[in-house]
Amino acid sequence: MTTGLHEFNLASRRAEEAAARRFQAVQWLKSVVGQLGIPNQPSEKEFISCLRNGMILCNAINKIHPGAVSKVVENYSYLNGEYQLPPAYQYFENVRNFLVALETLRLPGFEASDLEKDNLESGSVTKVVDCILGLKAYHECKLPSNGNGLYKHVKTPTFQLSATKIHPTLSASKTSRHLDMSSVRERNDCTDGESDKLKGIAKLFADHIFSSKENIDENLVSLENGSENSRANFEKILSRFPELQSVFKNLLSEGTLKPSDLKSMPLEELPVHEEDQSSRSLSHKTKCNHKRLLKTQEKELAVLKNLFIKTKQDFKEFQVYLQRDLMELGNQMQEMSSAAQGYYKVVEENRKLYNMVQDLKGNIRVYCRVRPIFNSEMDGVIDYIGKDGSLFVLDPSKPYKDARKTFQFNQVFGPTATQDDVFRETQPLIRSVMDGYNVCIFAYGQTGSGKTYTMSGPPGRSATEMGINYLALSDLFLICDRRKDMMTYEIYVQMVEIYNEQVRDLLAENSSYIRTCSSDDDGLSLPDATMHSVNSTKDVLQLMEAGEVNRAVSSTSMNNRSSRSHSIFMVHVRGKDTSGGTLRSCLHLVDLAGSERVDKSEVTGDRLKEAQYINKSLSCLGDVISALAQKNSHIPYRNSKLTLLLQDSLGGQAKTLMFAHLSPEEDSFGETISTLKFAQRVSTVELGAARAHKETREVMHLKEQIENLKRALGTEEWNNVSNGSKEIKSPFSRPIATTERTPPRLRRLSIENCSSTKANLEDRRGIKSPLASRRAQILSLEGPMSCKNEENGKGDPTMEVHQLKNPRSPLSSYQNRAVKVDGRTSIPQLQLLQTPVKGASRNDIQMISVDSKTNGKGSHIRKSLRTIGKLINGSEKRKENIPADPRSPLGVANNFSHIKSPDTSNAKTMRRQSLTGVMPPGQERSRRSSIGGKPIENGKKDHVFTPFRLNKFNN
């Protein structure tokens, strides 16, 4: 324990003494040269790094002895604070010149290798410090004597020892006799064995000195200052150790040094003349070492130079190769880029062609979306999702080779798909709404599979989590802004839900129920629902939030926020272009309630009732899809309110898309397979090509003409009814009741006559009902148009009504009165079958002549004429159910044999007139009368054909 503490104290004192000597050397160099750029108490590495380039040493020796170093290389500044390895020539030249100057001044030096940073051996730093302190002593000795003073450098006795070195500085004159261990070491430097012995002596001497516990520091300081005689003090120290005297005496007498035989010897017997000899030998050896080191460094420098030249050439070759490879790589990248562009172009064209084929076939597009697994520890049933729309699922109850099931859809979105990815695929379909097409997108799947997330987004959604409802409206507003120079759009929205088979308005203040589900001509499936106009996405977001608040939502064991109703978000678009054409379309965004199993959802009470209604409506939807897939003649749309509202979308003339949502957990495998099979069945449904709801300006003009025609016909027939009812009161003008036994001859009439006239026989009691206007409308459209009237009808078309009025006297004749009615309408040239009409008057025979000019396209008016044809067929059916009036002289030809002519006074009068040959003017009579009188001819213009007989009148 005592020995270890002694060694620690000894090492500490030695380190302090070495630091003190370095401090003295640095302070002296700063006073001579200037700032060195190192701390006042530097470490050994910092001290050596500062002196490595030799500039400081050369400048210091030139200060002491001007001209000692003739050339100093000064291209490296030691004041910059960066101690980097200087160039080799500067290192060797400055250090070599400094060592040569030291040799000239006969001052102790050191080896150039002592300045190597990586070669700090024991005692190397001590040599450099001793050299600088020697320069200091030489400088101080030279100043008082004006350059002629005596100088004696005293080195540290243990400068060769790293672990036991001490650094006292001793100053004395050269003539003084003292123990100089450096002289002994230099004298015996020629033999390595003696050097080892000297080291042992010095170590033993140092141990004895420090073990004496004397205050040597004060003595050393006094010796350094020159206040005391160093020789006397040293002799005093040695006198206390008689064994050292015997050791030195034996050493000098025998010529050999052994640590075990050390004896004391007097200091006077130490040789002094050998000091110069050892110094010269050391200087010669140092010079030889410097030359050898310089040659070695020159050889290494030449090798490095050759290596640098070779490396430079290799670098140039490598640069050429690199440029060539870069050019080849650029060409390959360009080819790959061109190929990739061509590939994507072909893919886009194929996609457009595929969508075109789908539009022509009218198939329902089916997209499948798989939500992420909520519990990461559970295994999923989704095995593979392909980019081509393929989907592989695994049945957990079967082995792997038999468990895989394959499905194919238009597109499949994996768990990592975002809302924007889903909307990007549906965007072309949604944008077709702005072109006049009806579009329906509905989400189908098990409860908790993510339907509401896809359509509306999660509660408290961010901008990146918005559903298709919001993104679709935002895209429609963007298109409206782009087309504002060509089209003017108006967008309206409705939001309803089907809750327990009742339609409820979600945007109404009281969320009232809508009892009727009808479809009007304006394209509204629910005209009673509240409709709101929207102009920005902000309006849409507010309405969506209001509707979601009113929607029926509840919590079950399968889903914390389960939708208990079918939500339908309807977007109505009305557009008008600059030419006056219009379009209308509707976008249905349907969020179906999820199918659920009651045993898994664990619902009771009202929730159970809701689940039953939900499953029933989804079952009806499945029945409709199956009927459409099998192309049945009857589609059960009316089995559910859901299918009734989706009738326009599923029944054709619309573009339809279904999202099939899947839950990937194993416990939901049954519902997943059911959803996939339903989606696969939906994908086989062909609805036919969708039809755009556009109307050009010409079509609108033709429809307006049809409406004007209908109004004109109604006004004209009402006038005819009014005039006919006023002229039935004369008792003298009742026509003869005759029978017609042959059916009408339409073909013969069309050949013989060029005019289109009709006979409207009214009831003898007069017309008492406005239904005659419809009969007149029917009769006005029966028969061909008159060629003569078509030639003469260049002015305004008119209708002429000829009536036979009662004469004021028996001898007066009937006069024809023509009532012209403005009917600027176009009557098509159609020949319809003649229908027998009841209700002809016994007093008057009404003749109607229609003269109008036909213009416009018949194809655009055909729809209106079909409507009129339905009225005709309807009137025929009604007439078949009404029994014939026995008082009417008119009837069907086949029933004439069962009808007897009334024996009235008027008939007798007519018979007498026929016998006498006197007939009232204008009185019509049949050629097939029972008397056989000659009928009156009217060759002027009126040839009237009735469904029962052909009469000719003469004026």
Swiss-Prot record:
GO CC annotation, single: microtubule
Record flagged with keyword Coiled coil: yes
Keywords: ATP-binding, Coiled coil, Microtubule, Motor protein, Nucleotide-binding
Family designation: Belongs to the TRAFAC class myosin-kinesin ATPase superfamily. Kinesin family. KIN-14 subfamily.
Protein name per the record: Kinesin-like protein KIN-14L
Keyword hit for Nucleotide-binding: yes
Coiled coil: 692-719
GO biological process: microtubule-based movement; microtubule-based process
Region (Disordered): 878-942
Domain of life: Eukaryota
Record-listed ATP binding positions: 445-452
